[in-house]
Amino acid sequence: MIEEEITLKIPKSIVNQIDELIKEGYFSSRDEFVRYAVRESLTEIAISKKMSREECKKIWEEYKIRKKDIKIDEKEIEELLDEVDKEWKKWKKLKLK
């Protein structure tokens, strides 16, 4: 694999957190952490591109229109979707920090 060197400026508080993870044995170096974080971010973006929340909502709305022959507890599904939505919002807040 061809590698390219880049320079990053990261707040000291984040560097301290990275260093703590290295001390705890999660990563062997800052480089390893940054490569991991970049791969994880690219994976998350790729997944979200494949199916956004809006696409999920469209699928749900279409299902509600076509559900005539399906016996299913709609209230239970809506509660589950509400839970997923709450978790999504929590996750997004964590990612923005």
Swiss-Prot record:
Pfam families xref list: RHH_8
GO biological process, one term: regulation of DNA-templated transcription
Superkingdom, taxonomy of origin: Archaea
InterPro entries: Arc_rbn_hlx_hlx (IPR013321), RHH_8 (IPR041088), Ribbon_hlx_hlx (IPR010985), Tscrpt_reg_CopG_prd (IPR016748)
Name this protein carries in UniProt: Uncharacterized protein MJ1679
Provenance organism: Methanocaldococcus jannaschii (strain ATCC 43067 / DSM 2661 / JAL-1 / JCM 10045 / NBRC 100440) (Methanococcus jannaschii)
Source taxonomy: Archaea, Methanobacteriati, Methanobacteriota, Methanomada group, Methanococci
